[in-house]
């Protein structure tokens, strides 16, 4: 049975690679992210907007694109145009990485709601990226691809930059409340307004937060303080 479960799990550990190219500036608003992904700019600049926050990514950065997030993006060419690579990861691969490295990523997950989605790409992560994309272009066995993908995620996590990418729509309600509040931290938020965004009743939201030993006002204060 254990071997069967491992085989099924391996078949779900999928990685996809794509390239975005443009000669002229592109602006895309309210782009939904369906699978967790990373974007590495090779030429030009990417402007990123999520909630009330903004960031600029160049060739020494990587953009984290968490599943379930809605982003505004602008791709700005330089003299040679705009080019970026995108790697997307199946939910099963993200879940396995979280399970294997919980001790390392737990703090990053707690801080993910206020972390930037544009982070530095250090030498270790850049090398892991290049190895993974080279393997995806060849007939590399799926088990090795999954290992290399987790190596890239680990390189980002060791740099303290993996939290937002690992957020799951099945995460605790408090984390999802934080994401809603980050849409506009200074707004006049109420339990009812946040519950509406999450398609819950206000009493249900309060009750489920209480089960997690969290309180709406405390979460709101944390978001506004940037904790």
Region annotations inferred by a language model:
Residues 131-141, 154-163, 177-189, 209, ...:
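Basic, amphipathic alpha-helical hairpins
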Residues 145-170, 197, 201-203, 207:
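Linker/hinge segments immediately adjacent to helix-turn-helix/homeobox DNA-binding domains
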Residues 11-110:
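N-terminal regulatory/effector-sensing and dimerization cores
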Residues 30, 169-170, 183, 220-221:
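Residue-level marker of regulatory loop/turn positions in helix-turn-helix DNA-binding domains and
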């Amino acid at each position: 049975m254990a071997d069967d479960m491992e085989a099924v799990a391996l078949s779900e550990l999928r990685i996809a690679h794509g390239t975005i190219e443009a000669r002229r500036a592109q602006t895309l608003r309210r782009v939904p992210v369906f699978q967790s992904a990373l974007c590495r700019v090779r030429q030009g600049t990417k402007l990123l907007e999520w909630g009330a926050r903004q960031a600029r990514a160049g060739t020494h950065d990587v953009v984290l694109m968490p599943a379930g997030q809605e982003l505004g993006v602008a791709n700005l060419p330089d003299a040679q145009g705009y080019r970026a690579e995108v790697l997307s990861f199946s939910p099963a691969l993200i879940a396995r990485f979280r399970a294997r490295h919980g001790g390392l990523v737990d703090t990053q997950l707690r801080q993910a709601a206020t972390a930037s989605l544009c982070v530095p790409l250090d030498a270790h992560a850049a090398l892991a990226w290049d190895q993974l994309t080279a393997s995806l272009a060849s007939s590399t066995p799926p088990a090795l691809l999954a290992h290399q993908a987790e190596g890239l995620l680990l390189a980002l996590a060791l740099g303290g930059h993996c939290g937002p990418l690992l957020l799951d729509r099945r995460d605790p309600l408090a984390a999802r409340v934080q994401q809603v509040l980050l849409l506009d931290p200074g707004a006049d938020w109420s339990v009812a307004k946040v519950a509406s965004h999450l398609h819950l009743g206000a009493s249900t939201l309060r009750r489920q937060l209480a089960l997690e030993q969290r309180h709406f006002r405390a979460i709101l204060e944390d978001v506004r303080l940037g904790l």
